[in-house]
Design a protein with these regions (language model features):
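Expand to "…catalyze enediolate/carbanion chemistry for C-C bond making/breaking, isomerization
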Residues: 1-134
């Protein structure tokens, strides 16, 4: 039998409402799955300046809420999916650089979806490391 990976992408506001229910259903069926969180796609919005973006605090919240939901249900988050670049782009708002809607046009280089920049990616890596230590 092969492996099954379930990639969740609820959006930061919906994780705690829906993920625990999904976990319970999967467990009741006796399925052994790998859980992966995609906090990018469920948190894409159109900025007031017209750019497709992702608020960093929403991405962060979805990751944190996913860890919380898995802990409460006795399961483990086995993976995360991020869209990122090592370049200093301004495609996602927020983070320690405090990128706002007006900053998006400065270095918006994506050919498709907005990516976390190097600073935001590192900030997120530290969050994941903190969650894994719990």
């Amino acid at each position: 039998m092969g492996r099954l990976t379930l990639i969740t992408r609820f959006g930061h506001n919906n994780v705690l409402d829906y993920l625990p229910k999904l976990i319970k259903i999967v467990q009741s069926e006796g399925l052994n799955v790998v859980w992966c969180c995609d906090p990018m796609h469920g948190n894409t919005v159109k900025s007031t300046s017209g750019f497709k973006t992702r608020p960093f605090d929403h991405v962060l919240a979805e990751v944190q809420n996913s860890f919380t939901a898995h802990r409460s249900e006795g399961t483990y988050l086995g993976g995360v999916h991020f869209e990122m670049t090592g370049k200093d782009v301004t495609e996602c708002t927020g983070g320690l650089q405090l990128i706002d809607d007006e900053d998006l046009s400065l270095r918006y280089h994506t050919a498709c979806d907005p990516r976390l920049n190097a600073s935001q990616s590192l900030e997120l890596a530290f969050l994941v490391a903190e969650q894994l230590e719990k």
